[in-house]
A protein has these predicted regions:
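Bacterial N-terminal signal peptides
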Residues: 6-18
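Short active-site neighborhood of thiol/selenol oxidoreductases, capturing the structured segment around
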Residues: 39-55
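Solvent-exposed loop/turn segments at secondary-structure junctions
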Residues: 51-55, 81-85, 109-112, 137-139, ...
Length: 160
């Protein structure tokens, strides 16, 4: 009886633990972009591609995190151009920049070129890469670190 109670207590404690942040990093596959866009129909959002190995991505993530803190209504979607095995690190890095609660994805295709082609035929994989979607889902793509005034201007024009 003692062992049964102890076992049930362990199950209760384990079941009460929060889901790990890595579990919140979804696999980005061929249909993921369409799903992301469809869920935000008529709403502006930023779609930011980055990688744990990208030298300039921390600057971008820091700026996005600061903007998110000032404007909690801004919808940011992060997609890491890494592998699902790196999900714990991806979640940890995003959280360290104040982006732990934004929607997160990670490339989950053996051929990332196929995903990049579906996302944007003109994109060759340079990172960071950010897509600004306005309310009508007009899209502006920008490679490289986006200056903070540019981000603030987009937020002012699109986030209410």
């Amino acid at each position: 009886m003692f062992f049964i109670r102890r076992f049930l207590l362990v199950l209760l404690v384990v079941g009460a633990l929060p889901v790990s942040a890595a579990d919140a990093v979804r696999p980005f596959v061929a249909s993921s972009l369409a799903k992301i866009v469809a869920e935000r129909q008529g709403k502006p959002f930023l779609l930011a591609f980055w990688s744990v190995n990208c030298a300039h991505c921390p600057l971008e993530l820091k700026a996005l995190g600061e903007i998110r803190r000032r404007n909690p209504k801004i919808d940011i979607v992060l997609v890491a151009a890494d592998t699902p095995d790196e999900a714990p690190l991806i979640a940890q890095l995003a959280a360290s920049y104040g982006l732990g609660k934004v929607e997160q994805w990670v490339f989950a295709d053996d051929m990332p070129e196929r995903l990049r082609f579906e996302i944007d035929q003109r994109w060759h994989g340079e990172l960071p890469r950010t897509y600004f979607y306005d309310r009508e889902h007009g899209i502006e793509a920008v490679s490289g670190v986006i200056p903070k005034p540019r981000l603030l201007g987009w937020v002012k024009a699109n986030v209410r």
